Amino acid sequence: MSYAKVLGATSRQDGYLEGNGYLVSWCVGHLVELAPPNIYDAKYVKWSIADLPILPQKWQYLVSASTKKQFGILQKLMHRPDVDSIVNSCDSGREGELIFRLVYQQAGCKKPFSRLWLSSMEENAIREGFAHLKPSTEYDALYNAALCRERADWMVGINASRLFSCLYGQPLAVGRVMTPVLAMTVVREAAIAAFVPEKFYTVALSFAGGGTASSKRFAQKADAELLLSKCRKEGRVTVQKMERKEKSESPPQLYDLTALQRDANRLLGFTAQQTLDYAQSLYEKRLITYPRTDSRFLTEDMAASLPGLVTDTGRAFAVEKPIPIHVQQVINGSKVTDHHALLPTKSMANADLAALPAGEWNVLRLISARLLCAVGEPHRYAETTLTTICAEEEFSAKGKVVLSDGWKAMERKMLGELLGKQKEPVVLPDVQKQSQCSVAGAELKEGQTSPPKHFTEDTLLHAMETASADSMPEGVERQGIGTPATRAATIEKLVQKGFLERKGTKKTKLLLPTDKGKALITVMPEEIQSPEMTADWETKLLRIERGEMEPSEFMTEINTMISSLVKTTEARKGANALMKNKILGVCPNCGANVVEREKGWFCENRECRFVLWKDNAFFKRLGKRLDAHVADKLLRDGRVRLKDCKSAKGKTYNATVLLSCEADGRSRFSLEFEGGC
């Protein structure tokens, strides 16, 4: 551990390290969690609309069953007589603050604690952080925001999931952030399905001196054909106007997490979660700064060290030409909150980058390229617009001449093959007003209007980030849905629960709602699926974090919304047909239908115990997954042939899995080997 190394705590014990007057231990995710409803009252074990809403007055917490041992170690360490103070060194963000405080409180600790707040895991940054520990009180508002977020998610999830599950007779997972994100994809698919393409026609004229000009669009083909005939007969165009404007494209901003995830999806095909995982690993290897940032700028005190970092980064990626460094382009302390923009670190200069896994190397490459581009010079070009007349109709053409590549040259150097083939700029002939040009060719072009595009991870992240922006007043900070740290997990959860699926043969997959996802949104009331309401809640959580809003005010609003939801929501007529589970086959035990649910394929007969679990231990031992295709084969044929099964010793073999039933109806699997092997 980096902290232990810097502090000199090098003696490894069970669950912690010790030395030089320090004890260094760790949390494993959320060690302490909100208690389930049945802890408040045993009646909540059974789901019933009559028991809703469930709105705890005094919140209760439990130690997570999977992390009890580590919690016990932390509790003992906190209460050791020789420990006089504690340092909260958890992740420098909202969730890290919550994780520590819940452990501290559940452990019954009263000793003073301070806060280590870092944006880099480099040894110098850690030493500096421990030398300037922050008072814990500076982060009380951050903790309050984290508590409100956790409790609001619990109340919406528990109450809405139970309400809609009871109304429609099957388990339905509803979430404060998850459901509005799903709704955005369903609305987009509905718009695509409802879209009626309209054909249009244009006439394109190519000039003898180079370049092509196009007419306006015609709805009727006959009108375009008439113009085409006239143009061919006339054979010349008269130049009405020639405009040349010099323009520039500023360098891109540094990455925050969402911008990095979007580019990694667009250029590399990575999911948001994959990018976050790669970035987290790079951070722990001290090669990049804190990844879960929402800022795209640096603070003023970083200006002096930035040129050295830029030079080191260029050298690490074999950039031989001198790098222009315009530091002030990336400095704006007023736009930095908890953490500055993502950067490579100076440690990268001495690291063996070739030894990195491919995914990590590519993410580091993106972050490094963005730094080198962000401090570069503008991309300058001249845009030419040519307007001509032929057969009394206006034709226009646009051309472009690059004056200075600027930052785009660095982008090509760093990311060349990822960017794909770039369009060659169109150079128009140099002509004078009222002069005439010969028409080398004229042709009819047919096109049609395009529907909205399906969401990819890139565009869905953008939609989450900018949700409600159009409906919020000017001057109000737009927070979007979720945070940079949680958006990836939201998408993954929707996929895992079967509401979204990734489809497509291209590197970057489409994110499409499943029939199950569409059905869920069909029955959801507006307040649960509204991106605007969820984005408004995120803004209020940010205000709590800044001490501008009382937590009690926010929680009262959530309570009121949930109470109203329970009181006013009724099952929609005809919706049960939409909500029916997909039938996969016939139960081999009792003959009833087997339907797919979140965790497996279940017999619809409540008296029957037959189920095929998706997370199946038998198939795991073979190194395989029990997916829909395998389940379908087992139900139809009672057997499925599997290739490349893995033995305990790592050897591979082919085998057939046979399905039968125990006396009580539960599924039983056995293996049949090929050739007696």
Residue ranges, per PLM feature:
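Metal- or metallocofactor-binding catalytic centers and their adjacent structured scaffolds
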Residues: 221-255, 261
